[in-house]
Amino acid sequence: MANRKIFLITSLIISLLLIHIFIFSPLNEPEKNAKAGPLGLSDVSVPSAPKLPAKDSTDFEVFLENPVIIFSRPGCPYSAAAKKLLTETLRLDPPAVVVEVTDYEHTQELRDWLSSISDISTMPNIFVGGHSIGGSDSVRALYQEEKLQSTLDEWTHNKVLILPTD
């Protein structure tokens, strides 16, 4: 019984420390007087793109505001297949957001950042509820195995639905 209490207290302390580190520790020192928008892009260049974390912050709001995000590379057949499945074949509510990584001035930094938080360095990199579920092959397999809705439910806490198509 005493070992269980020690384990629970230790687990709680470690969890609180990790939350503190995640929320309050910037990846880099902020730039002084930075005027560029997220990832060095002016805010008016890509009006339909979601707000992405600045290269000098731990701002993960993009994942809170957009439960399904497809980080994509134009011209990539795997990116095209994932976008087609999640934006045309299926009707998601809310709809998936497509982020073309080459639209950003700091493309390589964005790709490195995505790789660091997901251990996936290829495109597309599909995030559901802030968690990478892999690329085109992974999402296609979930769809074919009829596990996509349960994955969406699990990672978004039932906030994304696959609606019937017309």
UniProtKB/Swiss-Prot annotation:
GO terms for biological process: cellular response to oxidative stress. One of its GO terms (molecular function) is 2 iron, 2 sulfur cluster binding. Belongs to the glutaredoxin family. Monothiol subfamily. Keywords: 2Fe-2S, Iron, Iron-sulfur, Metal-binding, Nucleus, Redox-active center. It comes from the Eukaryota. It is found in: Nucleus. This is Monothiol glutaredoxin-3. It holds the Pfam family Glutaredoxin. [2Fe-2S] cluster binds at C76. Coiled coil: none annotated. One of its GO terms (cellular component) is endoplasmic reticulum. Residues 56-159 form the Glutaredoxin domain. CDD domains: GRX_GRXh_1_2_like. Monothiol glutaredoxin involved in the biogenesis of iron-sulfur clusters. Binds one iron-sulfur cluster per dimer. The iron-sulfur cluster is bound between subunits, and is complexed by a bound glutathione and a cysteine residue from each subunit. Homodimer. Gene3D superfamilies: Glutaredoxin.
